Amino acid sequence: MSVADIKKQDIVKDNGRSANDTGSPEVQVALLTARINELQPHFKAHMKDHHSRRGLLRMVSRRRRLLDYLKSKDADRYTALVAKLGLRK
């Protein structure tokens, strides 16, 4: 199950610098966050699905690396993105 194309386009429009900007760290983090959030109910229902959990952990670590990169390059964009996506408590 993946993020639908229309939802993906909305995420790109909301977080990208332009409508076709799919490579910026903000867009990549937002897309990964959407995929991670979609998988949460699956893991609540299937707690022993370790094979898929490994993929989830891979997505989480990739998002973490992208956030670390963004924080090192531009801290203002990092804080804005974290606040927008609600990643930190």
From Swiss-Prot:
Keyword ATP-binding included in the entry's annotation: no
Regions of compositional bias (Basic and acidic residues) in chain numbering: 1-16
GO biological process, one term: translation
Domain of life: Bacteria
GO MF terms held by the record: rRNA binding; structural constituent of ribosome
Pfam families: Ribosomal_S15
Gene3D superfamilies referenced in this protein's UniProt entry, alphabetically: 6.10.250.3130, S15/NS1, RNA-binding (1.10.287.10)
Chain positions covered by the region annotation Disordered: 1-24
Keyword annotations from UniProtKB, A to Z: Ribonucleoprotein, Ribosomal protein, RNA-binding, rRNA-binding
SMART domains in alphabetical order: Ribosomal_S15
Example of a GO cellular component annotation carried by this entry: cytosolic small ribosomal subunit
Keyword Ribosomal protein: yes
Free-text function comment from the UniProt entry: One of the primary rRNA binding proteins, it binds directly to 16S rRNA where it helps nucleate assembly of the platform of the 30S subunit by binding and bridging several RNA helices of the 16S rRNA. Forms an intersubunit bridge (bridge B4) with the 23S rRNA of the 50S subunit in the ribosome.
Assembly information from the UniProt record: Part of the 30S ribosomal subunit. Forms a bridge to the 50S subunit in the 70S ribosome, contacting the 23S rRNA.
Family per similarity comment: Belongs to the universal ribosomal protein uS15 family.
PANTHER family: RIBOSOMAL PROTEIN S15, BACTERIAL AND ORGANELLAR, SMALL RIBOSOMAL SUBUNIT PROTEIN US15M
Identification of the protein by name: Small ribosomal subunit protein uS15
Classification lineage: Bacteria, Pseudomonadati, Pseudomonadota, Betaproteobacteria, Burkholderiales
Gene: rpsO
